Amino acid sequence: MVATGSLSGKNPASISELLDCGYRPESLLSDFDYWDYVVPEPNLNEVIFEESTCQNLVKMLENCLSKSKQTKLGCSKVLVPEKLTQRIAQDVLRLSSTEPCGLRGCVMHVNLEIENVCKKLDRIVCDSSVVPTFELTLVFKQENCSWSSFRDFFFSRGRFSSGFRRTLILSSGFRLVKKKLYSLIGATVIEGS
C-alpha cells in the first residue's frame, strides 16, 4: 500500500461523490487519509524459480508413477490425465508457501486409491537436509471406467492373456491432505476434480 496526499490521481467519480455528500474541496485532504493500492512489479526471478520448482515437482510425481507401475501396481502402462500432475504441483506449492521452510520442509506420501483401498506408492522427501515441518498425503484416484474392467476380463481369458498386462487409468480427481508437524491444528484437505 502506498499513502498519497494528492487528489490529482484520484478517480473523478469518487471525488464528485464526496463533493455531492457535502464535503468541501479544501477539507478533503485534511479530513481523509487516502490510500492507493499499488500492484508491485512481478519479480522475474521469483516467477522463473516458481515455474522451475513446479516443473521439478511434476517430474518427481511422474517418476513416482513410472517406478510404481511395475513394482507396486503390476501394470505395463499408467495413463495420466493431461495437466493432472501440473495441477497437483501447483497445489503443493500453494500449500507449502505458508510454511516456515517452504517446500524444503515437505515430506509427501503418494498413494493410489483403487476400489476404496489406498495403496502406498512412494514417500518423497523434498530436501533431506531440512527437518520436515509438514506432511502432504497425495491420493491419486483410479478412473471408474467399466470398459477397462471388461477389457481386462476379456483379454485375461483369451489367447492374449500371456502377453497382456493391464493399463491403469488415473482419474482427474485427487486428494491432497496437509498435516503440520509443529502444530496441533487440524489437517487441510484439498479435493481436486
Swiss-Prot record:
Which species is the source of this protein?
Pongo abelii
Q: What is the lineage of its organism?
A: Eukaryota, Metazoa, Chordata, Craniata, Vertebrata
The name under which this protein is listed is DNA damage-inducible transcript 4-like protein
Q: InterPro entries this protein is in? A: RTP801-like, RTP801-like_C_sf
Q: What is the annotated role of this protein in its UniProt record? A: Inhibits cell growth by regulating the TOR signaling pathway upstream of the TSC1-TSC2 complex and downstream of AKT1.
| Assigned keywords, A-Z | Cytoplasm
Keyword Transferase found: no
Question: What Gene Ontology biological process does one annotation of this record name?
Answer: negative regulation of signal transduction
Instruction: Name the source's superkingdom.
Output: Eukaryota
Membership in a protein family: Belongs to the DDIT4 family.
Q: Name one GO cellular component term.
A: cytoplasm
Query: Source gene?
Result: DDIT4L
Q: Where in the cell is it found?
A: Cytoplasm
Q: Is Cytoplasm found in the keyword set? A: yes
